[in-house]
């Protein structure tokens, strides 16, 4: 396990060291010491979370690949503020697990899943929380059900490019809160659910035409 800048407090260090001595601390993301140790460890996979942009030498230190999760359906919603922008663009709320490359959320996709919106939501924040939890669950599932069993996760290339998302401003969030209360997540969930296939999504032209 590798902990970077925001996890260097002594109390947090001690918490992790209670469970394992195999914990490494880095002073700087993408720093030379981090790159050297990753190379020395000769790892197959690097799993990241909220880590910022990785430079190519760090990505290449993992023999098979670097995995990350994303609280939206790739390739339709990349960047920030992706849950609100997804709903705004007619994309169902969901989550993805993917291989990291030098682009922003552009790596090959491993798995995607819709947020279950069959029950009502009352704010955008609720949907965002569900998407965050689902993203983490998908990543853990990939680790335990695939990598943990000696399988190398599939790669589904992102052949389609969509406009990057940005954070919603205060007024946009208020508008989206109202749309959420009116059932936008549930409507999109019903619309996208038939396109789901086990482990992936239909990326046909029909699907593309659904995205505004």
Predicted regions and their residues:
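One-carbon transfer enzymes
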Residues: 1-212
